[in-house]
């Protein structure tokens, strides 16, 4: 995830935190220990939270063309990294598997913005930003929700996309939150994720000097993320994957806190079929099976990765979550095709970048990968092999 991009300059304002220890962090997994981790996602829980103080909040919409050739994402970042002034930014990625030279990355600050409920508007030199949650009806006639995303803030990119929820959304547990603080009943920070693991995407993408791209019920994924503290104080590294195929979808989100919070790890996820959410997990795992050093910056970058997500089916009662017949397991393992390395602090002047790295121990890079991968799924006594598209990120902060 682009968490560090959302608040990179905040590294310039403070040093590493004191060593509070693991006892000053409470993973969301604790709230569901011995219980079904599935938490339903109500409409009010799609609202922007806008926490007080330093924070970063995002809505990110991913799309995959059904032919596997094109992928991208649209992200709105609403942040207050210094706890002083809110800012907003629109980022857009479009990658073409057949013509990588035509890949597009765009980032634009927006003004006069307003997050209200689940919606977001901003004025711009063109038509601005207008993201609105609207009632919708899926192909089977069932009532659902959709985000209508219209963005035109530069000559480079114009978007008109509708992301319609295909299966149940979810969070982990009753709140979806991990908490930071010496008094966890009154935490000074929090991390929260909520997901639409599978969506249908239709609409148009217009990029300068390129043919208009049309999506028609292609694959989509949505995540709403909130960090109620400075990004480099919340996590030292991240792993993320979303998998999409005609039959199945999966997501795993993994992060490790800095040593100031005991290098605690949170790994959550969920798996869906084309028809319904199957199971969620508060104890998923991620392994960098093979790595290669990025000699320029020193990080060990994964070249072969394994994500494992196991948990009870969403309709299983708490007392029955450990019964084998009530559980599902999914494994994503394969080689990674490098898409891009993002130097988060590249635009900060060299002397400030050096200062930030010295003071905060930060050298944040995001490694993005995009390729096909096989999904191994075990559920209801069946072993299923599936093949689909993945987008994966490995983020190193400190």
Curated annotation (Swiss-Prot):
InterPro entries given in the database record: Ceramide-binding_SVF1 (IPR051385), Svf1-like_C (IPR033394), Svf1-like_N (IPR013931)
This protein's GO CC annotations: cis-Golgi network membrane; cytoplasm; endoplasmic reticulum membrane; nucleus
GO annotation terms (biological process): ER to Golgi ceramide transport; response to oxidative stress
Region (Peripherally associates with membranes), start-end ranges: 1-18
Primary localisation category: Golgi
Family per similarity comment: Belongs to the SVF1 family.
Protein name as it appears in the record: Ceramide-binding protein SVF1
Organism: Yarrowia lipolytica (strain CLIB 122 / E 150) (Yeast)
């Amino acid at each position: 995830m682009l968490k560090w991009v959302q608040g990179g300059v905040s590294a310039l304002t403070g040093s590493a935190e004191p060593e509070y220890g693991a006892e000053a962090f409470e993973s969301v997994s604790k709230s569901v220990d011995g219980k079904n981790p599935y938490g339903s996602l109500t409409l009010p829980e799609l609202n922007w939270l806008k926490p007080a103080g330093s924070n970063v909040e995002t809505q990110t919409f991913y799309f995959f063309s059904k032919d596997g050739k094109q992928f991208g994402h649209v992200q709105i970042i609403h942040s207050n990294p210094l706890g002083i002034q809110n800012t907003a930014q629109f980022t857009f990625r479009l990658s073409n598997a057949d013509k990588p030279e035509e890949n597009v990355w765009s980032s634009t600050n927006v003004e006069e913005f307003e997050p209200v409920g689940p919606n977001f508007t901003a004025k711009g030199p063109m038509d601005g930003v207008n993201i609105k949650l609207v009632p919708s009806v899926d192909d089977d006639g069932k009532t659902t929700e959709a985000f209508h995303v219209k963005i035109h803030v530069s000559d480079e990119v114009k978007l008109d996309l509708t992301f319609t929820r295909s299966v149940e959304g979810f969070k982990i547990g009753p709140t979806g939150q991990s908490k930071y603080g010496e008094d966890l009943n009154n935490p000074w920070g929090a991390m929260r994720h909520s997901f639409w693991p599978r969506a249908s995407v239709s609409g148009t993408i217009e990029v300068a000097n390129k043919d208009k791209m049309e999506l028609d019920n292609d694959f989509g994924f949505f995540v709403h993320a909130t960090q109620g503290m400075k990004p480099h104080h919340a996590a030292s590294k991240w792993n993320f994957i979303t998998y999409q195929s005609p039959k199945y979808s999966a997501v795993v989100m993994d992060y490790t806190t800095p040593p100031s919070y005991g290098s605690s790890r949170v790994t959550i996820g969920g798996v869906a079929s084309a028809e319904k959410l199957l199971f969620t997990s508060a104890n998923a795992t991620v392994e960098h099976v093979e790595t290669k050093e990025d000699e320029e910056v020193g990080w060990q970058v994964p070249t072969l990765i394994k994500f494992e997500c196991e948990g009870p089916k969403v309709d299983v009662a708490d007392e029955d979550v450990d019964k084998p017949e009530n559980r599902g397991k999914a494994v994503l393992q394969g080689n990674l095709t490098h898409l891009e390395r993002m130097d988060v602090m590249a635009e900060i002047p060299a002397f400030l970048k050096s200062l930030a790295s010295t003071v905060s121990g930060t050298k944040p890079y995001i490694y993005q990968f995009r390729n096909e991968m096989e999904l191994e799924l075990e559920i209801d006594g069946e072993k299923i092999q599936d093949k689909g598209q993945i987008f994966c990120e490995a983020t190193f902060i400190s």
